[in-house]
Amino acid sequence: MVSVLSRARSLTRAVSATVAVAALLATTACSSPSPDSSAGGEAPPRDRELRIAVQAQPASLDPAQLAEGQQSYIWASIFDTLLTIDNEGKVQPNAAESWSYSEDLRTLTLKLRSDLKFSGGDPVTAKDVAGTLERTRSTPGQQQSKLARVTSVSAPDDSTVVIQLSEPEPSLTNYLAQATGVIGDPDTLAAETTKLRPAGSGPYILSDATVDGTEYVLERRDDHWNSKAFPFKTVKVRVIADRTAQFNALQAGEINAGLVQPPQRKQAEAAGFTIKEVDATAALVLILADRKGELVPALADVKVRQAINMAFDREQVVKALMQGLGRPTVQVFNPNGDAYNSELEGTYDFDPEKARKLLAEAGYPDGFSMTMPSTVISGSYEPVITQALADIGIKVTWEPVPPQNTAASVSSRKYPAVLWFSGLNAAGREIGDMYTPQAFLNPFKWQDPEFDKLLQDVANEADEEAQADLYKKVSEYTVKQALNAPIAYTGTLWATAPGVEYLPKVNVLPTIRTFGVTGG
């Protein structure tokens, strides 16, 4: 393992700290970044331009097919969401100016703003919201599972939306602040054009200058109810799959905000970029999806999953591949959240010998083989993952997957395990994304009666302190049963050119709201 990590140091220029946008600074000298300008001077704050890069184009802009992550920069600009998550990570009003739950937590009522309009000028009504949610609920896609407990969505009047639940869903307001909560125009949702040019009520519209798959140009709607909260008149989102090419774009001024790696920090600061460090923005996790053993029977055995957890030298991964911008962990939950339990750290120390013994006890003395998707997430980590698992007897074959199909590689059920970056959302949201039968990261729909009861207890608990204790029990179960193999939390370093500021202090959904302007 250590020898592979030593060799892997040569790969660090290609390592991305998160699943989000990655922009590297080269080791050659770079010129000072240019401020946003027009005709040779800094533009007024309201006329500034934001230019960022993403590694993959959106697979679709259909509300029922939206993916979170880098694609959010685009769709969250086109669509309003019912609620929003601020730069401190808290759920706040947005298109819905208020919301309330019934006493039994099975009815959520939202009140819409009165000044919502689609980009074409038509008013947004509760009927539009209900229609969008009902379509998402009935359409296969990443968002469908998040509405699994919804039994109906109604609009008793133009400004009221009522969501009925079969049982409490502690993450529902969080979902409605992200892709699940977008508002589409039901009259156009079924149109083929929605995949590329959807009708939304968000603060931006896609300009005719957009070249699908290459660059998405967003122009601010000054008639939007919240236009003043978006300081950039124009936002350009370039698709640049190669991380070194992203650096070149940053250096050349083609983009004016991007991620940098720790070794380039001083160089970036010397070149005039402002650096913002955000701690624990994601968790690098080997998702052991096939816990039912449908593709790889060995993964159904807890001893095998525990052995996999012992295969990784987490300290060395952080040191060599994350260049110290991270910390080892065996948990998938946010270290600043309710579910995190520091006492669980150290459950799986690096111990290949013990891992091999566990495999033998499980009936696999000679190990086994499995195929995993090679994605924009896994690329730089593949040599380490391959060698670590080979050292305990597990042979991994990597199958290339196009960047735009990264999410589909999880839901396809073709792969027993997937290397993934978990976004460190609220505990309930992480459970909904990873562990419920409908969860995106649980494609084989694994269940366990003991775990199901624990999740139900969490959902039914209204007291926040008591619920936090239950969340910790959830984390303990996931660690002891080795449902996945978390490796490390990773942070990010944002580099912004003069005139642009990165705002969040914690991990939040990547949207245009995370950027502000500086200077007069």
Across the structure, where does each feature detected by a protein language model lie?
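N-terminal lobe/hinge region of extracytoplasmic solute-binding protein
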Residues: 53-101, 134, 199, 495
